[in-house]
Amino acid sequence: MKKKTKVLQELIHDGKCHLRPLVAIPLQAQMAEALGYEVVGISGAYTAAHILGMPDAGLITMTEMVENAKRVCDATTIPVIADGDTGFGNAINVRRTVKEMIQAGAAAIFLEDQVAPKRCGFVKGKEVIPLEEAVGKIRAAVDVRNELDPDFVIMARTDARTAVGGSLDEVIRRAQAFEAIGADIIYVEAVQGRDEVKKVRKSIKCALAASAWDMKPYPTLKEFTDLGLCLTLGVMFFEAGLIADYEMLKNMKEKGLEYWYEWREKAQSHPASWQRIYDMVGFPKVREWEEKYLPKEQLDKYDKSGGLYEPR
């Protein structure tokens, strides 16, 4: 089997833009893989909200992000792009962050040029560090990549477009500097329209990714490809799940437990029903291992016990 880093290198250089859903938990990555997605990203914002109940404001630690990344990477065979925030310190800290993410099994990391504490790229109040300091951080990341796995993908993100004092010229200046020291992908946050994407694309030769929140109407995947992008950014599909959670809780509160029972009966055949989720996370594999490794008499438990689900 090819290394995940090698697979991702091939994806970002195949001339197509790939849809990259953002996840925070292993099960979401497993769902994405089961549905045929080729790559997933870990959202720092969603991870902070999911495991801490806190905003994406520089409050989550490197250890928490790495531990979560390892769980996601272990659960899927497709490449995972990890969120490295600002590297959790200066260029020296970046070295350790990149090393830890490589050891966790990530295929890539993106590092941004915001000041610390940083904030979600969609939130007002962003500031960026001086270019020289940002270059030092990306250089540190590239050095660790070259030492440990030359195929590991370094995605250098700049928030300079909508940060205090930001401009497209500053975005291009930073993109060119990051490319010159070995970044594999330039990631531009909050690019303001298709014309700006085209200008950035013409200014660099390496792979390019850009968020689409300020591009109206929103581009199709084909248009992203035509614009020369290699990955979509910020496909936060988990919003749909959170809305569904909210509606379920609201309806149970207002209509009682009967609402849950009725909904549950209708959901039995859905590909994401709890029985199918048990299949997805590996109960059948556990039974396969039991049959391979355990004494035969211990397998009688399946015939001598009851339950709503039997792994097969």
What do these predicted regions represent?
Residues F178, K253-G256, G282:
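Intrinsically disordered, low-complexity regions enriched in Ser/Pro/Gly/Gln/His and often acidic
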Residues S269-F283:
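Gly/Pro-rich interdomain helix-loop hinge
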